[in-house]
Curated annotation (Swiss-Prot):
Converts GTP to 7,8-dihydro-D-neopterin 2',3'-cyclic phosphate, the first intermediate in the biosynthesis of coenzyme methanopterin. It comes from Methanococcus maripaludis (strain C7 / ATCC BAA-1331). This is GTP cyclohydrolase MptA. GO terms for biological process: tetrahydromethanopterin biosynthetic process. NCBIfam families: GTP cyclohydrolase MptA (TIGR00294). It is an enzyme of class 3 (hydrolase). The gene is mptA. GO terms for molecular function: GTP cyclohydrolase I activity; GTP cyclohydrolase IV activity; iron ion binding. Homodimer.
């Protein structure tokens, strides 16, 4: 029995839709590495196309079908080295399957396992970062497809609040003065101890556009995020490691804004070879320990704009 193509019929309400597709779709993916073993990921996909006002629905099954075809092709034939390139492959296939679409978008997220060593006892453990990629394609009036791709990571760290630390330092100075300590002794005491403050679990995110002919290493992005907070977090810490991590974080207090700005500076320094119109997204979220709310800072810009601002500040 032949079924009618209900999706191709006209809708009752003729309004176009920006994004229609599927989310929370998981697939096993293998990515190639030069002279190293393959990376195995279990990413979650979000896949969308636009829908014209003249059509009732997209052919929904075609979107997961595209991912299945691309993933199988990678496993059997084609060599893909990055999650951003995987996203581009899917976008191009979406246009083939959804001939009515003028825009297509793919987002993927995956846990990424790394080896980490504790700072004092040198204990090895597995640490998890989240890696992500986005590809966005637009079909012009001539039928030519233009695709932009981005790659990024999300990393958890620790931050120490400078404000509370400064207040506790002032309280300590007042208390020591009342007990008869000289200003010189107070300075020596405070230089010898770690001043307390409250901490946050910081979540840093960096997304960078990958222009055609360029590469952006995810490992470099992960390092930038780690180095931009008060300190790193570790799955395995012995007592001496724990003391070291806490002390170092308190010696490097940072607001959520400080972390975001530090990431911006490091991105500009590390990826100085990228074209000036390269898009960059930086985001920091700090999970507060003494509040129910979270702290948030973000910048969405280009390499040129960020570099120009940094130059202005240093001149």
């Amino acid at each position: 029995m032949q079924c009618n193509d209900v999706q191709a019929t006209e809708p009752d309400i003729k309004v176009s839709l920006t994004r229609v597709g599927v989310t929370n779709l998981k697939k096993l993916v293998k990515l190639k590495r030069t002279n190293k073993r393959d990376i195995v990921l279990l990413p979650t996909f979000e896949v969308f196309v636009d829908l014209p006002s003249s059509q009732k629905g997209i052919h929904m099954s075609r979107s997961p079908e595209v991912i299945e075809e691309v993933v199988e092709n990678i496993l059997l034939e084609k060599e893909i080295y990055g999650v951003e390139d995987l996203s581009v492959e899917i976008v191009m296939k979406l246009f083939e399957k959804h001939e009515y679409a003028t825009r297509a978008e793919v987002m993927l997220y995956s846990d990424y396992m790394m080896e980490e060593t504790s700072p004092v006892t040198q204990k090895d453990s597995q640490e998890i970062a989240k890696i992500m990629a986005r590809a966005y394609g637009v079909k012009d009036d001539c039928g030519k497809i233009h695709v932009k791709k981005m790659v990024g990571a999300e990393v958890v760290g620790i931050t120490a609040c400078p404000c509370a630390q400064n207040m506790l330092k002032e309280n300590a100075v007042t208390s020591l003065k009342e007990k008869g300590f000289s200003s010189e002794d107070i300075e020596k005491i405070l230089d010898s101890v770690t001043i307390a403050t409250h901490n946050q679990r910081g979540i840093g995110t960096v997304m960078i556009e990958v222009p055609s002919g360029y590469t952006v290493g995810i490992s470099k992005i992960i390092k930038i995020i780690k180095d931009s907070m008060s300190g790193e977090v570790y799955e395995l810490l012995k007592r001496s490691d724990e003391a070291y991590v806490v002390e170092m974080a308190h010696k490097n207090p940072k607001f959520v804004e400080d972390c975001a700005r530090e990431m911006i500076k490091r991105v500009v320094d590390v990826f100085d070879y990228l074209p000036e119109d390269t898009q960059v997204l930086v985001r920091q979220v700090n999970k507060e320990s003494i509040h129910r709310h979270d702290a948030f800072a973000e910048r969405n810009s280009t390499i040129r704009e960020l570099r120009d601002e940094l130059k202005t500040l240093t001149n």
